[in-house]
């Protein structure tokens, strides 16, 4: 069929409804709509393909990420194992660096400790030398002082002994007691056995350690005057005048010790008795008899509680005079 025949309208049949009219514009619109529909279906198909591709790509990326993470873990684990092996072998760089730093600190502390030890040792040695010198100096000073004190003490004792010896030589003749001449008769058969005479021997001259040098020299001068020949004196001279008992050097007192008591100047004195002690220089001391010995007594001053030793010879010669006093 030709195009004209296709385009020409068919003859209308009798009794049939009229055929619709054909317009070319409508065909074009229909074709355009079909094209648009086909284009839309094509786009939808492309979008579905793209979505499927994106899903596959996401799955592939996730697998790659997991694989990469596992690989990183394995690499890090291998690195740590390698570092641990190097640390055990001592070849790890970080370990060597820190060990070097610790070694430097150790050497520095050792050096400081040695310097401190040296400094302290020098200080101790200096103190030792100083203390040793001070001890030696103190020892020498004490030795010299002790020697001087002993020499002075011995010289003093020597001087006192010489003075006492001189005093005994000068007063020896006056202190000697002449023995009583007695005749021993033959005892008759009926006579009783004679009882021996229990007379107490006179006290010998005692060394005096309580007098000063001035008192000793004064006693020596007095004794020398007594031993020198006396010249006749006129009644008006001072020597002819009667001397008082305290001033007369030739006056002697009766003094003895019996049964732990002192008999002096017709009075008895015992231990712990309060007395006055008068010396030749008119010094009067308040004392208490501390003890009574065989040939001497000890008295204690009430002022300073110092003790003095008084011999019987001194009391007999009048160098010291004892007076009673009230105990209150």
Swiss-Prot record:
Modified residues (Phosphothreonine): 49, 244
Pfam families referenced in this protein's UniProt entry, alphabetically: Sds3
GO molecular function: enzyme binding; histone deacetylase binding
Basic and acidic residues compositional bias, start-end: 56-65
Coiled coil (residue ranges): 66-171
Tissue expression per record: Expressed in various cancer cell ines.
GO CC terms of this entry: cytosol; nuclear body; nucleoplasm; nucleus; Sin3-type complex
Sin3 interaction domain (SID): annotated span: 188-226
Residue list for modification N-acetylserine: 2
Chain spans, region Mediates interaction with USP17L2: 2-170
Keyword Transit peptide: no
Residues modified as Phosphoserine: 32, 45, 53, 228, 234, 237
Highest taxon, organism lineage: Eukaryota
Subunit: Homodimer. Component of the SIN3 histone deacetylase (HDAC) corepressor complex. Interacts with SIN3A. Interaction with SIN3B enhances the interaction between SIN3B and HDAC1 to form a complex. Interacts with HCFC1. Component of a mSin3A corepressor complex that contains SIN3A, SAP130, SUDS3/SAP45, ARID4B/SAP180, HDAC1 and HDAC2. Interacts with USP17L2; the interaction is direct. Interacts with FOXK2.
UniProt domain comment: The C-terminus is involved in transcriptional repression by HDAC-independent mechanisms.
Function of the molecule: Regulatory protein which represses transcription and augments histone deacetylase activity of HDAC1. May have a potential role in tumor suppressor pathways through regulation of apoptosis. May function in the assembly and/or enzymatic activity of the mSin3A corepressor complex or in mediating interactions between the complex and other regulatory complexes.
Name this polypeptide is given: Sin3 histone deacetylase corepressor complex component SDS3
Organism in which the protein naturally occurs: Homo sapiens (Human)
């Amino acid at each position: 069929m030709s195009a004209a025949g296709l385009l020409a309208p068919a003859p209308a049949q009798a009794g049939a409804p009229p055929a619709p009219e054909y317009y070319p514009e409508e065909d074009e619109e229909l074709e355009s709509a079909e094209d648009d529909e086909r284009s839309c279906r094509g786009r939808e198909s492309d979008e579905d393909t793209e979505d499927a591709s994106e899903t596959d790509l996401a799955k592939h990326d996730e697998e790659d990420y997991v694989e990469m993470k596992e690989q990183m873990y394995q690499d890090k684990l291998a690195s740590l194992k390698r570092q641990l092996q190097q640390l055990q072998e001592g070849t790890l760089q970080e370990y060597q660096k820190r060990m070097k730093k610790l070694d430097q600190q150790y050497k520095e502390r050792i050096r400081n400790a040695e310097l401190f030890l040296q400094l302290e040792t020098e200080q101790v040695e200096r103190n030792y030398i100083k203390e040793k010198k001070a001890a030696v100096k103190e020892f020498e000073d004490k030795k010299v002082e002790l020697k001087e004190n002993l020499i002075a003490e011995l010289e003093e004792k020597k001087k006192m002994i010489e003075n006492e010896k001189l005093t005994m030589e000068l007063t020896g003749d006056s202190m000697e007691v002449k023995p009583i001449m007695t005749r021993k008769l033959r005892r008759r058969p009926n006579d009783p056995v004679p009882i021996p005479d229990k007379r107490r021997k006179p006290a010998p001259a005692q060394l005096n350690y309580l007098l000063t040098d001035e008192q000793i020299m004064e006693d020596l001068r007095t004794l020398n005057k007594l031993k020198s020949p006396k010249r006749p004196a006129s009644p008006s001279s001072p020597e002819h005048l009667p001397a008082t008992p305290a001033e007369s050097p030739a006056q002697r007192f009766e003094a003895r010790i019996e049964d732990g008591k002192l008999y002096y100047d017709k009075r008895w004195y015992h231990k712990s008795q309060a007395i006055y002690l008068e010396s030749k220089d008119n010094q009067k001391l308040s004392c208490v008899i501390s003890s009574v010995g065989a040939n001497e007594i000890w008295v204690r001053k009430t002022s300073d509680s110092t003790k003095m030793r008084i011999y019987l010879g001194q009391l007999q010669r009048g160098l010291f005079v004892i007076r009673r006093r009230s105990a209150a």
